[in-house]
Amino acid sequence: MNTSFTRKSHTFLPKLFFRKMSSSGAKEKPELQFPFLQDEDTVATLHECKTLFILRGLPGSGKSTLARLILEKYHDGTKMVSADAYKIIPGSRADFSEAYKRLDEDLAGYCRRDIRVLVLDDTNHERERLDQLFEMADQYQYQVVLVEPKTAWRLDCAQLKEKNQWQLSADDLKKLKPGLEKDFLPLYFGWFLTKKSSETLRKAGQVFLEELGNHKAFKKELRHFISGDEPKEKLELVSYFGKRPPGVLHCTTKFCDYGKAAGAEEYAQQEVVKRSYGKAFKLSISALFVTPKTAGAQVVLTDQELQLWPSDLDKPSASEGLPPGSRAHVTLGCAADVQPVQTGLDLLDILQQVKGGSQGEAVGELPRGKLYSLGKGRWMLSLTKKMEVKAIFTGYYGKGKPVPIHGSRKGGAMQICTII
């Protein structure tokens, strides 16, 4: 017997019955096993983030059930925007351009209010539509979690014909199916820090840059940061590393380029990646480092976190002889014309030198730990006490290009920033 509840079947059931069914059923049904529903650490961590859950799937596949469960789990501070409420029939967006305009205005309104958990319930089968949503997430600094039903019939058009509330035919459903058959891969996967953890780490990085810039040992090495034509008395490192990530910080695991990068699909298909998607983790920061090109934080991965670290990242010669996961880092800033990928390479360069027996010269103590000069304008602050930061494992789906970053409650554009 089919125990799923479509809009048609649960309309006449008491709300109390549905609430009882959904909360208990979520623990038992395999199709409802998602970390953001089952794992209490993840639920608590998501309350500290701004997350846009984008549901994808054919009509009748179980999206609305998932949407209601997310609303129920997160209570206050949660809003759902459903295409159904705008009388949008799944199919061509061109037929409902005005309805989608109203939907997007309402969604953006919730973003401006800093609603912690937003749920968008629609088929979301078109790449162009998803790109619009990802751009909005960038503008309002929301992390994205794509959610697709795990029901056995999610791609079975014959069954979905009977389940969907719009009475779409099997042929109608088949037209929507191609955009939903393959996993939608991000620009990259990674751990995305909560807002509080991002602010804490960003502040620690800024303080380090200020302390380093004022340190007498650093002032003697300014030639690595300033050309010969410039004055060499002092350098404002916070301004020097002006290319900084807006919003939440992150630690990249796998660069996917939306599925075009080597090994991207294989990585995304790993059971541990699927199981961990949308789950909370606690990352450990052991050191802060600066080179003439980048500023970053070294991340020490646990055995559990290393399962999400792609093996191909440890193949380049820069990683040779180093433990798996040595490249794990959070980019705090880049110098002009430097790409964020350089941060990990700079860290590997430092670690190779340390492995070779040259930890550098200890030049003093800072409030958070011991400062080392490694030559060539490279500096590392070894933290006396490791920093623990909370993060969600998910993907970044935007374009990674400059976008107008909107203020939240005050509204309006604040600045143009690049997602890095």
From Swiss-Prot:
Its EC number is 3.1.4.37. It is a lipid-anchor. The modification Phosphotyrosine is found at residue 110. It is an enzyme of class 3 (hydrolase). A lipid is attached at residue 417 (S-farnesyl cysteine). The modification Phosphoserine is found at residues 9, 169, 227, 239, 358. Belongs to the 2H phosphoesterase superfamily. CNPase family. This is 2',3'-cyclic-nucleotide 3'-phosphodiesterase. It comes from Mus musculus (Mouse). The gene is Cnp.
